[in-house]
Amino acid sequence: MCNAYRIGRDTRSTPAVLPEGLLRDLSEDRLVRRTDRAPVYAGGSDLVTMRWGFERPGLGTVNNSREDKLDGPMWRKAFQERRCLVPATGYFEFTGPKGLKRTHLFARADGTWMWIAGIWEESSEHGPCFSMITTEPNATVLPYHDRMPVVLEPGEIDDFLAGRMRHFKPPAESLRVADAANPLLKRPRPVQEELF
């Protein structure tokens, strides 16, 4: 789930609990794929660049962590000590059989930033790495996938970063979903309406 997301475009919507101007350098639309380096907020006054995905022996790169597994040995220390926010303007999901998959882009209905709950750790090989936390889907996402990123509301950000938020639920706000070209292909197939 969620192997690619977008950043960029909207710089108006930094929640009041975060430093003013935090998103000023993210006005260019950009795709982030698993193992790419991307900006995250881990406290302080600026975004920092981290690699998307924890490396685990036998598992390779694990880019998402389930909220119901955060007390397990793979995630516990990062969840207790190193939380972060992943800014995104949308994320992608895929449905259908191999070779005929359809791509769907999920974004906030008002077009503003999503603040996705994350955790991070230091890797001797890759430097700082982050993972998104996932939860059960809300009604918008359920027809497409059985998990979704934890999208925090502005009022939840402080509690999450301070470690006071330990349980997650899908956001009540419905997200906008649209068909999209597959961003993981070198030359994405056009979306149907782009053909005419």
Indicate where each model-derived feature is located.
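Short linear sequence motif anchored by a di-proline
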Residues: 1-196
